């Protein structure tokens, strides 16, 4: 839902990521103008989850900002080339820079979908004094346009060869109120950074004009829904993941009671780096804000335009448009900063949408060799903020140098801020009206955590006041000074280590009201408080800032010189959720290369990752600084990219671009962001130039996803920025405590970092961020409006503040994706949790975090903590409080964590902040005790700086965030918010900011945990940070932070929802009073980390108020949650959901999940992710405490809803109606199907009901008096009756008092209306294990049914109805599921089978039955809809397509499978007219034309005439050919319409009369029948005669039999055979193989015929019954088969395997067919590898092929895998029919074949006589018969095998009992067998009787052939025959006896599976030599060795087929 919402918002405003991205890019482009094409390389982050690494190598004059996201190296190279090209031309003019920004844009491959011809890249029309000067955004702008309304071509930013011309982001303010940000994509012009030169008008890329009009009026309503770009989800994820991305511009954010929310526009460029891309023109029109002074946010946009030139980064085409180039990010940052340039406190400033441009191109190598620093391959774009103040131009240049060591480049950002007065001469007068804010440049180096970038604000307080104004000053790009101001905030914060959280926090304070726009996070505090533009450059600014404030001032001066460039407000176009992902994180805004390279180098030496404000050229040219920046950039990139927000508020804004944008729109100044940025810069500045050595940061993906978010890098980056700031501060300002603080801060940062890593799973940046936050907090104190960024404190402040916004924007994006939490937990450093948290929660947590991080970060011990404290209260506070860790204690400024967003104002308000913190603490009744020791330390410090302890900070942060960013205009609002913060009501207002809230919460949580761990343990600290940050932010943005925190914990789900809500709802602007009212006093709760993420584990404010604060932030956000839940309909049941938001009192204050005030929210949020957060939304006010905890009902509902009630085929879930009917109308809100939930929570609800006064008097109906009531009336009152509103006590009391008159099975008021929904249908027992439906029945409750049907006594009316009492377990289960009320359970419930009830209803109550059926149907549909809704909430834009593709793929697979099965298994089709089965020609048969067919027919005819064998490869005749030649097939059929028959037969009228076409008129002519019969017999005779050589007698008999057989049988059989042939043909080969042992027919001997006949008769009868064929005469048995062979004629005259005739088998030898009795298919025995001996036996019974084979005993062909096949006769038996457990190992022989060929014994022990003889001769003892029986299983038949000399098939030659095998001479075996045959006959007969007694059940008389003969009978008739036939066979065979082998095979018990036997024609072919194992494997079932062990089983029928034995 969050994603969807965000997308919707983006679509609406096109501003989600794109606006800010565009603004940033323009700013970057403008500032880049000085710095050649550094921005040209900005890469757009491809994936929302990818961290945008700001990798920029800043050329001497060129600044490169590169966000290395997931861009390919080639793209990076292209970007580098483009950057280098840009670097080549360093023209200082701002206009040129702006043009270059446009160039960069075109260079930058933006994934802009739609391209419209864009106006020529003319300099943005001179911005009206107030209006944002047109700012050109770099390619990132085009990238950011991806999802924007202007879907400019994905190729935005000329990803092609040349550096991308940054899109000019023109912010034309028609009036000061209106800010128009126009993103112009200019064609890639000369790589020159000069905007004018490099960007000819013709060069402009096509830009689709995107116009956003922001109403000037209502702060809450003012926010235009942000449209996310086409890639909004991606963009939002990217931007929110990267704070950098979020360049929430506070442009034009006037502190107003009703600030405008400027939609955040995220433009993502997916274009290939080199290809010029069309960047949509983004025009953001901000209606004039009431406060004129604040209205000049244009300067920021101008600045953005200036930096935009450089900011242009190639966007990665493949990447999502969501990311714009880092340059664009920087430009957006600049624009934010400029927007806040106007005096933040007094004048309400218009908020200028944050323009964020994300480039997907990986900026991993912003290696364009910089002219100045070729050694540093990677350039960091220089960010120059030029502030033209009255008569004074201040240029702040932030140069981000790539740390070659870190291998990351940081874009150089240049922000030119000209006060309106300072703008071009024409505009100078206009600009004069507004003070010139001194832009604060904060550059965060994500690359190197160790390096910090320092933002130096050259101008002192005066600029702070005019900061917002500055953006407008120059129509030329010159006014860009603030361009990156808002962004810089987040950047610097990131560098500082508190990252965007601080700035973000500050932003939230002012932003609170405006935070409605999901993606737009613009901190008013940024615009207000940061007079100096803090450029939160993600790329660590080169030490240039660190060089000397003088250098920074020089850069300012240079910028002033360049003041002509229009100030462009940077609008963060990237969605705030992923602050770090968007390229904006790496701002490429460089107003010019004015900053002297020396300065930049010095800065680099200082390793001030963030150059505060070095002269633009210096910054641009200082590439050495890039390396420190690189580290920071690495951190930033690794961490969620943070928008470069010049203004401190940007800390929040950068982190939460949406919030920042909103704040900007609502008028919150970017001042706070600027301050933070400055602070960050100051802190980072001191970093030595060593960073330059660091390698450019390779592209770091900023993942919006919780785990994906590059939090670690982010945290590191923050730390680095802090270090850089500290270094800079120390180096430049030589701040004594700066070094110490830096060291301490580094320690703190490290600790935080580690802690964060522990808590969040991210190590590196974690500590960095907190230091930044701390620094920022310190700077907040020191960095008042009056303080200059150059002042270390101010720098730190600005940097810190700027940092949090960046982080926030990214964080928000993550949160929107619900990744924030995971992100924080996974990448605590990346997210810079402490900073990020403050950003989310407000300045407080960010400040605290910053301090903590500093303290923890050993690298940043010297960071001046006080400046971080100076960070605006909102920013520092939120952050500071949670982040305030013991480690933080070292940084003094950390204590002063006061949010820095409004630093300029914050300074003034510093005292007020601490006082407000105290007041807020008092109001909220926050116990600071739980803050922790470090926080206590922080408390003192922060209290001083109005940051105080996390609680104080939260309060302070809220107050200050409100005050500092919005202090001037929104001060009361802030106070209210503070109040609100304490109050749960905050939740209600926050819904508007839900998404922001989520991202904030996640960011806060993620950020906070490490600092908190230091202080309270990461979870507590995070909780505090989240809460504080949430509070400040939620209060300022009124975002449901509770939801956020829960969402952060569940970062993947709820956060996104919340963000969405925030975006959609304007409730975030709810009056603080409401928020206050909503908070209920709740005990302080410590949030424990959520299951979803450690981030969630945050300590709630210590006191009930703190929990309230947490709740306040959470509460403030909770309404958001509610809204979010409502909007998101996260609750599956929206019906009750609405109620939840109503009672804010219910608020998160009561942590349901051990989350303290937020606990509920979090749990509810967690559940909200699943259930829509109803719990959190449910008002605490509701008296549902007795029920489950607040969230309980929602949880119960969720459980109940998730609980499938399957009754029969119907799923039964109680309806909302049912709920309403069953339960009292208590205020509790249930989800749709929560009736169960209500019931479910009966304990809770009933308690609630009891506790609540009855809403309506409950009648004591007569049912109480009913005589028939089953049980006591007391319990009779059920929760179901709660609907009547009478309390349970009253009911119970009345029940006791009233006499029982009637008995009713259910006691319910008579007037109660029971609907179908009241019937519980359930399955019992509940599903278990793998077979859920096993032993389950569907039941109903008799009492409920009786009530529904209106039956007084169901038992009496239906006495015979089966019923059962419900046991305790079932009753409890029913109650839990809410299916049965407690009252009913107490009365006693009876279960009846649902089927019976349905039958009764159908028979007797049809209307009720129909009603119930309809109810079930509708319920089922509702369930489906609910599931779809639940799925739809999280379904991304592409899911529909994915589903379609999956469906297509599934259909394709199924069709393929179906067709394959048709070809393989269902080949045949049956003609229903003739019942003729048509089969496809075998594949072996060549396809031929009719001509070939006729030719083959001719040849065949000639061959037959000449008695010549037909050629083997001759095509077989078609079936119809033979069919029409045979009587069977010659049945006339009418032709169906359109049926075509190629061959047909013409009947004569006389013939037709004999056929019953309609009615048979004549009898068939006798002559015709005779002819047919004769033809048949002749055909068969000739056929058989040809192949009868082996058995002439048999053939003769067969022929005679055929003649005697009536024709009907053959015809019928042949038809049946044809019908069955389909499957049989396929299986014939395998079956015959299994039956591959047979004795040649010749071996059957003379007596075989009679025996065969009798045997076959029995076989046939049984088989025929099996195959549904009637038995024939005894002679018909074998004769029938042959006769059928004849009748089948041509079609059946070929082998089913080789397709040859009988006289020619596969070996080209004549061979008689064997025919399957069932399918009539004929095969050559050799084709199925059937040995000759087996063939002889097969011919003696109705043999079936493998496909048709039926078990001889059960007559079933099912379960062929369980079938054993006799290796001698090929009969099949199921192992379970034989009593065997498994398939025997070796070969197996059936009972009929298991007899000794010498003695006729049917057991392997032999006959008793033989046993005695053998005993005498050493054989088995005679008296050992019983003992032998005991050893029976161990004895096995001895088999002899031989290889047939003709077929080479291994066949079974003989079987002997053990004594005979021992005694017989091997060579004389055959003779012995022959001699003993006569004697054996009686023995066999005797044995047959014994066999029946054998343990194994006899197969039955019918076992083998289905014979009905008794065993003796079966044996006796054939006894003589087998004996007679044996000798010849034995003689012919060479016997190889393998006793051991046979024994091994023979174990029937061990038989495993004989599946192979049935289907393998290879089994017999495998018979080789001994082949025992082979055979065992193949013929598993046939192992005869088992005969002994399984003898009982085999014996009974064993000898039945003696002929078979032969």
Curated annotation (Swiss-Prot):
GO cellular component: brahma complex; cytoplasm; euchromatin; heterochromatin; nucleus; polytene chromosome; polytene chromosome chromocenter
Polar residues bias spans: 67-81, 189-199, 485-494, 759-769, 828-844, 1053-1080
Regions of compositional bias (Low complexity) in chain numbering: 10-60, 129-168, 321-347, 543-563, 978-990, 1018-1029, 1103-1112, 1161-1173, 1627-1652, 1660-1677
Stored Gene3D superfamilies: Zinc/RING finger domain, C3HC4 (zinc finger) (3.30.40.10)
UniProt feature, compositional bias: Basic and acidic residues: 525-534, 744-758, 936-945, 963-972
InterPro entries: Znf_FYVE_PHD, Znf_PHD, Znf_PHD-finger, Znf_RING/FYVE/PHD
Annotated PROSITE patterns: ZF_PHD_1 (PS01359), ZF_PHD_2 (PS50016)
GO molecular function, one term: transcription corepressor activity
Span of zinc fingers (PHD-type): 1694-1751, 1753-1796
Region (SAY): 1340-1573
Tissues expressing the protein: Widely expressed. Highly expressed in ovary. Expressed in nursing cells and growing oocytes at all stages of development and accumulates in mature oocytes. Expressed in the nuclei of syncytium blastoderm of early embryos and in the nuclei of different tissues of late embryos, larvae, and adults.
Keywords associated with the record: Activator, Chromosome, Cytoplasm, Metal-binding, Nucleus, Repeat, Repressor, Transcription, Transcription regulation, Zinc, Zinc-finger
Biased composition (Pro residues): 118-128, 861-870
Compositionally biased region (Basic residues): 1147-1158
GO biological process, alphabetically ordered: chromatin remodeling; negative regulation of DNA-templated transcription; positive regulation of DNA-templated transcription
Biological role stated in the UniProt entry: Essential transcription regulator during early development. Coactivates transcription of some euchromatin genes and repress transcription in of euchromatin genes translocated to heterochromatin.
Family recorded in the similarity comment: Belongs to the SAYP family.
Written domain comment of the UniProt record: The PHD fingers mediate the transcription repression in heterochromatin.
Name the UniProt record assigns to this protein: Supporter of activation of yellow protein
Species per Swiss-Prot/TrEMBL record: Drosophila melanogaster
Gene encoding the protein: e(y)3
């Amino acid at each position: 839902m969050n994603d969807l919402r965000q997308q919707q918002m983006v679509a609406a405003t096109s501003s989600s990521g794109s606006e800010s991205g565009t603004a940033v890019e323009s700013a970057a482009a403008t500032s880049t103008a000085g710095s050649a094409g550094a921005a040209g390389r900005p890469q757009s982050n491809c994936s929302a989850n990818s961290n945008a690494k700001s990798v920029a190598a800043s050329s001497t004059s060129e600044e490169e900002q590169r966000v290395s996201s997931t861009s390919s190296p080639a793209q990076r190279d292209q970007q580098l080339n483009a950057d280098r090209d840009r670097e080549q031309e360093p023209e200082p003019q701002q206009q040129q820079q702006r043009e270059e920004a446009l160039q960069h844009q075109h260079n930058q491959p933006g994934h802009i979908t739609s391209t419209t011809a864009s106006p020529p890249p003319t300099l943005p029309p001179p911005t009206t004094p107030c209006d944002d000067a047109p700012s050109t955004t770099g390619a990132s702008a085009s990238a950011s346009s991806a999802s924007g309304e202007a879907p400019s071509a994905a190729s935005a930013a000329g990803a092609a060869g040349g550096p991308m011309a940054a899109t000019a982001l023109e912010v034309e303010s028609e009036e000061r109120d209106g800010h128009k940000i126009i993103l112009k994509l200019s064609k890639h012009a000369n790589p020159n950074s000069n905007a004018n030169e490099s960007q000819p008008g013709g060069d402009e890329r096509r830009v689709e004009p995107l116009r956003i009009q922001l109403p000037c009026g209502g702060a809450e309503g003012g926010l235009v829904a942000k449209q996310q770009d086409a890639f909004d989800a991606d963009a939002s994820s990217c931007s929110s993941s990267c704070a950098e991305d979020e360049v929430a511009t506070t442009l034009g954010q006037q502190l107003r009671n009703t600030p405008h929310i400027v939609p955040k526009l995220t433009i993502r460029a997916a274009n290939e780096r080199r290809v010029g891309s069309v960047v949509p023109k983004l025009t953001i029109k901000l209606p004039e804000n009431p406060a004129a002074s604040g209205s000049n946010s244009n300067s920021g946009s101008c600045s953005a335009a200036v930096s935009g030139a450089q900011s242009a980064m190639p966007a990665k085409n493949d990447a999502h448009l969501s990311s714009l180039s880092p340059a664009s990010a920087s430009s957006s940052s600049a624009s934010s900063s400029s927007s806040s340039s106007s005096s933040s406190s007094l004048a309400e400033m218009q908020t200028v949408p944050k323009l964020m441009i994300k480039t997907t191109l990986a900026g991993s190598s912003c290696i364009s060799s910089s002219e100045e620093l070729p050694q540093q391959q990677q350039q960091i774009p220089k960010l120059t903020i030029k502030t033209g103040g009255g008569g004074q131009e201040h240029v702040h240049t932030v140069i981000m140098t790539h740390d070659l060591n870190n291998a990351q480049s940081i874009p150089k950002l240049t922000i030119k801020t000209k006060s309106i007065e300072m703008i071009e001469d024409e505009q100078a007068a206009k600009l004069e009206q507004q003070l010139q804010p001194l832009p604060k440049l904060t550059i965060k180096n994500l690359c190197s955590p160790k390096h910090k970038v320092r933002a130096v604000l050259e101008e002192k307080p005066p600029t702070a006041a005019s900061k917002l104004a500055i953006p407008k000053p120059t129509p030329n790009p010159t006014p860009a000074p603030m361009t990156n101001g808002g962004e810089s905030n987040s950047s610097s914060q990131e560098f500082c280590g508190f990252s965007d959280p601080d700035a973000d926090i500050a932003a939230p304070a002012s932003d609170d009201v405006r935070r409605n726009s999901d993606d737009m996070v613009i901190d008013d505090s940024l615009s207000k408080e940061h007079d100096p533009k803090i450029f939160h450059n993600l790329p660590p600014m080169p030490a240039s800032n660190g060089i000397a404030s003088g250098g920074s001032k020089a850069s300012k001066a240079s910028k002033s010189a360049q003041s002509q460039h229009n100030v462009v407000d940077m609008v963060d176009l990237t969605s705030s959720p992923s602050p770090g992902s968007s390229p904006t994180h790496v701002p490429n805004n460089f107003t010019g290369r004015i900053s002297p390279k020396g300065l930049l180098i010095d800065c680099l030496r200082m390793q001030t990752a963030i150059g505060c404000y070095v002269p633009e050229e210096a910054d641009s040219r200082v590439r050495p600084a890039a390396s420190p920046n690189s580290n920071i950039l690495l951190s930033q990139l690794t961490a969620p990219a943070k928008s470069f927000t010049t203004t401190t508020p940007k800390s929040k804004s950068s982190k939460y671009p949406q919030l920042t944008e909103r704040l900007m729109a609502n008028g919150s100044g970017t001042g706070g962001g600027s301050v933070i940025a400055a602070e960050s810069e100051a802190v980072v500045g001191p970093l030595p130039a060593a960073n330059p050595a660091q390698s450019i940061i390779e592209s770091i993906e900023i993942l919006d996803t919780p785990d994906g978010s590059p939090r670690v890098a982010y945290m590191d980056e923050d730390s680095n920025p802090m270090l850089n700031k500290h270094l800079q501060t120390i180096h430049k300002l030589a701040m004594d405590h700066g070094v110490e603080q830096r060291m301490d801060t580094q320690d703190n940062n490290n600790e935080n970092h580690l802690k964060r890593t522990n808590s969040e799973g991210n190590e590196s940046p974690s500590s960095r961020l907190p230091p930044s936050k701390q620094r920022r907090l310190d700077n907040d104190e020191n960095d008042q409006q009056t303080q200059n960024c150059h002042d270390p404190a101010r720098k730190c402040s600005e940097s810190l503040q700027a940092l949090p916004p960046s982080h926030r924007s990214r964080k928000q994006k993550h949160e929107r994706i619900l990744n924030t939490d995971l992100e924080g937990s996974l990448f605590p450093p990346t997210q810079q949790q402490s900073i990020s948290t403050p950003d989310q929660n407000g300045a407080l947590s960010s400040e605290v975090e910053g301090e903590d991080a500093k303290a923890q970060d050993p690298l940043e011990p010297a960071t001046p903590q006080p400046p971080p404290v100076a960070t605006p209260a909102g920013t520092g506070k939120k952050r500071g409080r949670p982040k305030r860790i013991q480690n933080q204690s070292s940084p003094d400024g950390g204590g002063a964590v006061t949010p820095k967003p409004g630093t300029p104002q914050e300074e003034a308000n510093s005292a007020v902040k601490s006082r407000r913190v105290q007041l807020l603490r008092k109001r909220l009744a926050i116990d600071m005790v739980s803050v922790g020791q470090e926080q206590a330390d922080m408390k003192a410090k922060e209290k001083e700086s109005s940051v105080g302890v996390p609680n104080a900070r939260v309060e302070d942060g809220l107050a200050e965030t409100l005050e500092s960013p919005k202090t001037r205009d929104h001060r009361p609002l802030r106070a209210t918010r503070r109040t609100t913060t304490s109050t749960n009501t905050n939740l209600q207002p926050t819904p508007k900011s839900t998404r922001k809230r989520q991202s904030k919460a996640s960011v806060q949580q993620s950020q906070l945990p490490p600092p908190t761990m230091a202080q309270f343990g990461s979870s507590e600290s995070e909780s505090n940070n989240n809460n504080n940050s949430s509070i400040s932010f939620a209060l300022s943005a009124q975002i449901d932070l509770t939801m956020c925190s829960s969402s952060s914990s569940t970062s993947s789900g709820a956060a996104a929802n919340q963000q969405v809500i925030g975006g959609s709802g304007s409730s975030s602007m709810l009056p603080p009073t409401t928020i206050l009212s909503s908070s209920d006093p709740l005990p302080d709760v410590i949030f424990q980390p959520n299951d979803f993420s450690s981030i969630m584990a945050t300590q709630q404010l210590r006191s009930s108020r703190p929990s309230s604060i947490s709740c306040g932030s959470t509460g403030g956000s909770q309404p958001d949650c509610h809204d979010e839940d409502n909007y998101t309909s996260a609750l599956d049941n929206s019906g009750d959901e609405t109620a939840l938001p109503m009672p804010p009192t219910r608020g998160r204050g009561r942590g349901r999940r051990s989350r303290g005030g937020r606990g509920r929210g979090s749990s509810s949020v967690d559940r909200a992710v699943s259930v829509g957060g109803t719990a959190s939304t449910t008002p605490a006010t509701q008296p549902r405490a007795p029920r489950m905890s607040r969230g309980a009902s929602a949880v119960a509902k969720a459980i109940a809803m998730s609980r499938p009630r399957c009754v029969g085929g119907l799923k039964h879930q109680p309806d909302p109606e049912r709920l309403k009917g069953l339960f009292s109308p208590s205020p509790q809100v249930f989800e749709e199907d929560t009736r169960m939930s209500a019931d479910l929570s009966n304990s809770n609800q009933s308690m609630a009901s009891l506790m609540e006064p009855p809403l309506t008097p409950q009648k004591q109906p007569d049912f109480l008096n009913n005589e028939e009531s089953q049980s006591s009336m007391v319990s009779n009152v059920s929760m179901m009756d709660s609907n009547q509103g009478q309390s349970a006590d009253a009911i119970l009391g009345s029940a006791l008092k009233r006499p029982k008159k009637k008995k009713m099975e259910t006691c319910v008021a008579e007037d109660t209306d029971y609907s179908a929904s009241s019937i519980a249908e359930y399955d019992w027992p509940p599903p278990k294990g793998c077979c859920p439906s096993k032993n389950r029945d569907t039941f109903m409750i008799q009492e409920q049914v009786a009530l529904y049907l209106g039956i007084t006594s169901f038992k009496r009316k239906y006495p015979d109805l089966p019923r059962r009492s419900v046991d305790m377990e079932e009753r409890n289960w029913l109650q839990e599921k809410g299916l049965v009320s407690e009252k009913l359970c107490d009365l006693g419930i009876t279960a009846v089978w649902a089927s019976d009830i349905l039958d009764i209803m159908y028979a007797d109550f049809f209307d009720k039955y129909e009603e119930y059926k309809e109810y079930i149907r509708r319920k089922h549909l509702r369930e489906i809809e609910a599931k779809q809704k639940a799925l739809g909430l999280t379904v991304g834009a592409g899911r529909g397509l994915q589903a379609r593709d999956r469906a297509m793929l599934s259909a394709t697979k199924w069709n393929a499978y179906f067709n394959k099965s048709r070809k393989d298994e269902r080949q045949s089709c049956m003609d229903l007219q003739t019942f003729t089965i048509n089969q496809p020609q075998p594949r072996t048969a060549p396809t031929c034309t009719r001509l070939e067919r006729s030719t083959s027919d001719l040849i065949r005819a000639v061959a037959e005439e000449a008695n010549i064998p037909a050629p083997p490869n001759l095509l077989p005749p078609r079936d119809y050919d033979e069919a029409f030649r045979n009587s069977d097939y010659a049945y006339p059929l009418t032709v169906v319409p359109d049926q075509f028959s190629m061959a047909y037969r013409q009947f004569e009228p006389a013939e037709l009369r004999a056929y019953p076409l309609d009615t048979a008129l004549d009898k068939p002519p006798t002559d015709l029948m005779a002819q047919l019969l004769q033809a048949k017999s002749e055909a068969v005779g000739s056929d058989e005669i040809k192949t009868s050589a082996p058995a002439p007698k048999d053939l003769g008999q067969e022929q005679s039999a055929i003649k005697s057989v009536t024709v009907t049988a053959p015809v019928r059989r042949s038809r049946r055979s044809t019908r069955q042939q389909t499957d049989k043909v396929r299986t014939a080969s395998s079956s015959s193989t299994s039956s591959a042992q047979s004795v040649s027919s010749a071996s059957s001997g003379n007596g075989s015929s009679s025996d065969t006949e009798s045997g076959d008769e029995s076989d046939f009868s049984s088989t025929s019954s099996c195959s549904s064929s009637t038995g024939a005469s005894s002679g018909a048995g074998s004769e029938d088969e042959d006769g059928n062979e004849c009748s089948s004629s041509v079609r059946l005259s070929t082998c089913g395997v080789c397709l040859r005739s009988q006289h020619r088998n596969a070996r080209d030898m004549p061979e008689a067919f064997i025919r399957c009795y069932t399918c009539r298919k004929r095969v050559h025995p050799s084709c199925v590898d059937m040995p000759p001996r087996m063939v002889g036996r097969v011919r003696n019974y109705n043999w079936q092929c493998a496909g048709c084979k039926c078990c001889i005993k059960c007559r079933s062909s099912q379960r062929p895998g369980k079938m054993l096949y006799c290796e001698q006769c090929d009969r099949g038996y199921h192992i379970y029919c034989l009593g065997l457990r498994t398939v025997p190992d070796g070969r197996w022989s059936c009972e009929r074949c298991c007899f000794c060929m010498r003695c006729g014994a049917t057991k392997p022990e032999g006959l008793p006589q033989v046993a005695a003889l053998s005993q005498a001769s050493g054989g088995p003892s005679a008296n050992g018969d019983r003992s032998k029986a005991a050893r029976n299983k161990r004895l096995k038949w001895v088999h002899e095998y031989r290889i047939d000399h003709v077929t080479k098939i291994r066949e079974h030659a003989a079987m002997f009992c053990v004594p005979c095998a021992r005694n017989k001479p091997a060579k004389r075996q055959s003779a012995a067998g022959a001699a003993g045959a006569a004697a054996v006959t009686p023995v066999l007969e005797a044995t047959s009787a014994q066999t029946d007694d054998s343990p194994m059940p006899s197969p039955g008389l019918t076992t083998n052939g289905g014979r009905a003969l008794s065993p003796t009978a079966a044996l006796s008739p054939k006894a003589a025959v087998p004996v007679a036939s044996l000798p010849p066979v034995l003689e012919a065979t060479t016997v190889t006896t393998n006793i051991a082998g046979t024994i091994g095979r023979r174990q029937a018990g061990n038989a495993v599976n004989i599946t192979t036997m049935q289907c393998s024609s290879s089994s017999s072919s495998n018979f080789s030599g001994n082949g025992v194992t082979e055979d065992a494997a193949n013929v598993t079932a046939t192992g005869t060795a088992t005969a002994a062990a399984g003898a009982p089983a085999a014996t009974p029928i064993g000898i039945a087929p003696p002929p078979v034995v032969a």
